[in-house]
């Protein structure tokens, strides 16, 4: 199991919270103290809670569920997109469209439109249009790609969300709650931890902190997917062996 160490958390600055005047009292159990007007997060609790979140995400992937990585603030965009892609999962790192989960059927129509536009440009169908029309189609494609590119292959709502900065992603979290989708989130000292199923207390502003925690969650997905593949392979081998024995008995 690829866990996270206290050293890694310290080096990435995961322990630095927000200014003491900008805090949510509900985060008090996760705060170690304050230094120079900044809250310091209790990393011992972060390590313990991270393990719980890691195990949950790994189990989701092992059972074949998809994880949607969400982080639209500038500091999170690259890590969310790159790490979700690395573990073959989906992501939203630009703008959360209202109804992305609760009205997924309508969102899927836009995804299908994006796929059709991609196909038109890939197979040359777009050449049948005028230059002006082709330019309009390309603008439409780029706009859809920006907001929906990370969920292009997502055929149904995800099994869980991994979120950076729940305060910034309230719409996504509210939609997940309505549908009973569990939420794993990196929760800073200014956030409300109550709606989060798996709280990871930590700095949600520093790029290094975001990258570290997001990459570890991607590792959890990969570990779960690998275990799932091994299970499926074992099952196939057992079925093949059983069929072989059956044929021998019949002979």
From Swiss-Prot:
GO cellular component: cytosolic small ribosomal subunit
Chain residue ranges for the region called Disordered: 232-251
Superkingdom of the source species: Bacteria
Keyword Ribosomal protein carried by entry: yes
Bias (Acidic residues): 235-251
Molecular function as annotated in GO: structural constituent of ribosome
Keywords recorded for this protein, A-Z: Ribonucleoprotein, Ribosomal protein
InterPro entries: Ribosomal_uS2, Ribosomal_uS2_bac/mit/plastid, Ribosomal_uS2_CS, Ribosomal_uS2_flav_dom_sf
One GO term (biological process): translation
Family: Belongs to the universal ribosomal protein uS2 family.
Name of protein: Small ribosomal subunit protein uS2
Organism field: Geobacter metallireducens (strain ATCC 53774 / DSM 7210 / GS-15)
């Amino acid at each position: 199991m690829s866990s996270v160490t206290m050293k890694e958390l310290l080096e990435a600055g995961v322990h630095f919270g927000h200014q003491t005047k900008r805090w949510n009292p509900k985060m008090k159990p996760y705060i170690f103290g304050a230094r120079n007007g900044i809250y310091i997060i209790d990393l011992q609790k972060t390590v313990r809670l991270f393990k719980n979140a890691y195990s949950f995400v790994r189990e989701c992937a092992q059972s074949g569920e998809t994880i949607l990585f969400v982080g639209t603030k500038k500091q999170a965009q690259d890590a969310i997109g790159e790490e979700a892609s690395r573990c073959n999962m989906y992501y939203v790192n630009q703008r959360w469209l209202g109804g992305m989960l609760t009205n997924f059927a309508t969102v899927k129509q836009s995804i299908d439109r994006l796929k059709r536009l991609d196909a038109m440009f890939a197979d040359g169908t777009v050449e049948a249009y005028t230059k002006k029309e082709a330019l309009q189609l390309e603008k439409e494609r780029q706009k859809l790609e920006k907001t929906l590119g990370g969920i292009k292959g997502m055929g149904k709502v995800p099994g869980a969300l991994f979120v950076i900065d729940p305060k910034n992603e309230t719409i996504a979290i509210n939609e997940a709650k309505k549908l009973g989708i569990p939420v794993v989130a990196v929760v800073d000292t200014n956030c409300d931890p109550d709606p989060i199923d798996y709280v990871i207390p930590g700095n949600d502003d520093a790029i290094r902190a975001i990258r570290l925690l997001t990459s570890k969650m991607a590792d959890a997905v990969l570990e779960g997917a690998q275990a799932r593949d091994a299970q499926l392979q074992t099952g196939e081998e057992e079925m093949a062996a059983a069929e072989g024995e059956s044929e021998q008995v019949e002979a």
